[in-house]
């Protein structure tokens, strides 16, 4: 699947608002890919498809997860808000001809993260959180940080997401906690956490 095909596909699957968000995420992902030397076309494709299953019903998502347990990554046992990313990756793999494992990984983990995230995984996760229409408190600080230090930005973003989920009284996806701990455990990550905290994130 090329970028034109992906754009046409999601245009037919998403509401105007969600489609606009998708294009904004694509722009941000490409911008970050340029900064960090990631393949821009890969970043663009992952961004275009990341929410392609966002507006299908939970029942449809459940059917997809059950139909492809080998790709479901924990499936129904994980909180429902993360299902759409996993389902989008499954559809991309099984129905839309996407074979690039890096792209599929980024799509699948863009909501919760996971241990061992690749550079592309991190770029899409951050692009989704900081696309131009996002206006949550602290987003401008994260936009600045992500252009300077990808891992410090990921720590800040994961902490922000996890704190928000817990504040809403909702279950935290174990993958999110594991992703945070994994990045923190890498060499030099204590310094990154201090950097994120010093910037108010």
Question: Where in this protein do the model-derived segments appear?
Answer:
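N-terminal glycine-rich anion-binding loops that anchor highly charged ligand groups
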Residues: 21
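Divalent metal-dependent catalytic cores for phosphoryl transfer on phosphate-bearing substrates
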Residues: 7-12, 30, 35-158
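Charged phosphate-binding loop/patch that engages nucleotide di/tri-phosphates or the phosphate backbone
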Residues: 163-201
